[in-house]
Amino acid sequence: MNHDQSHALFSRAQQLLPGGVNSPVRAFKSVGGEPFFVERADGAYLYDVDGNRYIDYVGSWGPMIVGHNHTAVRQAVKKAIDNGLSFGAPCAAEVTMAETITRLVPSCEMVRMVNSGTEATLSAIRLARGATGRNRIVKFEGCYHGHGDSFLVKAGSGMLTLGVPTSPGVPAGLSELTLTLPYNDFEAATALFEQQGDDIAGLIIEPVVGNANCIPPRDGYLQHLRELCTKHGTLLIFDEVMTGFRVALGGAQAHYGITPDLTTFGKIIGGGMPVGAYGGRRELMQQIAPAGPIYQAGTLSGNPVAMAAGLAMLELIQQPGFHADLAERTARLCAGLEAAAADAGVVVTTTCVGAMFGLFFTSEKVETYAQATACDIPAFNRFFHAMLDQGVFLAPSAYEAGFLSSAHDDAVIEATLAAARVAFKAAKG
């Protein structure tokens, strides 16, 4: 593939943008090489500025569940734009969005729109602290909840890729209020709550870890956390920025049958546009200003264009069989990847929940952060570049989940597996 135009753009970007990008993982620092620059996207494909086409398993990091540039979403955005971009005042679409979310996710009796997943998680933590009168929060090793100071303690995603467990610039006094647990460890959670449970305002978790690759919860683990939180008066917060409306119509909480106190959502409710939301029980949400004393605000929150895009997308994914079909195709992709690896003499394991999947270069079933970090990262990097050379774009980090959309049809999956049969041979080194 020719990448002359992308190389020229990256050279210019490095002079003006830190690392040449506006979000760290895009720089390919973990896998090596340089990123390609996207010109357009359609369906299951990205097209770069040099005219190369890629099957896309990043999906703008999750929200493109109906594929890129879907006609219904695009038309909804065009119609909204005809009436203006942002009002700084209430609009009908944000009410319809709230009605839709509360109907599809019953644990959210009320919601507040924000502009990103990070805003949603930061706001949820503030609400948990304000509602309980406590200061400590609990998160999990390898889980990423945005770039808020409270979360950059043993974080995942870009932080894990960079190998930095905590970020400079986070005050020690603040980071000391964040307690970190190993994911999927029943005993550690029990012990922590026995020692400090009555001081913990909230426990925030990705119900399926998507920022240390894709790690599902062990049987009964989420229920165990629910019981601990209930016993100690701690708010259970599900970060469904990745899993919401993707692993099931009602998110991971519907898939696993667990009811959190608060839930955060991200860009998927904007059809890929910048948006987020958090919601929960009415008595909690009523404590947010102006109904209550816990302050949170945003000029662009609930803006009509993002709401229109999100509503169009949410209507599409409510079609009968949508999620079951996506889950079946994701499982078929994972089975095909394992078979292709075995044929090449490469040891891999896969995970999948709904339309999320993970690929690990290890013989172990990966259930913990420690297992994820012990995988053969150089082998993944070789595999990544071999797939990219054949026009398949995986996340440029061994610590990120993959995503399918309804545009990933049988032909796309078979083309992916054909590329994988070649790429696994390159991964052997």
Curated annotation (Swiss-Prot):
The N6-(pyridoxal phosphate)lysine modification is found at 267
Q: Could you name the Gene Ontology cellular component terms for this entry?
A: cytoplasm
- Which cofactors does the annotated protein need, by name? pyridoxal 5'-phosphate
A Gene Ontology molecular function term for this protein is: transaminase activity
The UniProt catalytic activity note for this protein reads: (S)-4-amino-5-oxopentanoate = 5-aminolevulinate
Q: Which Gene3D superfamilies match?
A: Aspartate Aminotransferase, domain 1, Type I PLP-dependent aspartate aminotransferase-like (Major domain)
Q: Does the keyword Ubl conjugation apply?
A: no
Q: Which keywords annotate this record?
A: Cytoplasm, Isomerase, Porphyrin biosynthesis, Pyridoxal phosphate
Q: InterPro entries, alphabetically?
A: 4pyrrol_synth_GluAld_NH2Trfase, Aminotrans_3, Aminotrans_3_PPA_site, PyrdxlP-dep_Trfase, PyrdxlP-dep_Trfase_major, PyrdxlP-dep_Trfase_small
Enzyme nomenclature, EC number: 5.4.3.8
> Where does the record say this protein resides?
Cytoplasm
Gene Ontology BP annotations: protoporphyrinogen IX biosynthetic process
Q: Does the keyword Isomerase apply?
A: yes
Protein's pathway: Porphyrin-containing compound metabolism; protoporphyrin-IX biosynthesis; 5-aminolevulinate from L-glutamyl-tRNA(Glu): step 2/2
Top class in the EC scheme: isomerase
Record-stated family: Belongs to the class-III pyridoxal-phosphate-dependent aminotransferase family. HemL subfamily.
Self-association state and partner proteins as the record states: Homodimer.
Checking HAMAP family in the record gives:
HemL_aminotrans_3 (MF_00375)
Return the protein name. Answer: Glutamate-1-semialdehyde 2,1-aminomutase
Q: Source species, please? A: Stenotrophomonas maltophilia (strain R551-3)
Q: What is the lineage of its organism?
A: Bacteria, Pseudomonadati, Pseudomonadota, Gammaproteobacteria, Lysobacterales
As recorded in Swiss-Prot or TrEMBL, the protein's gene is named hemL
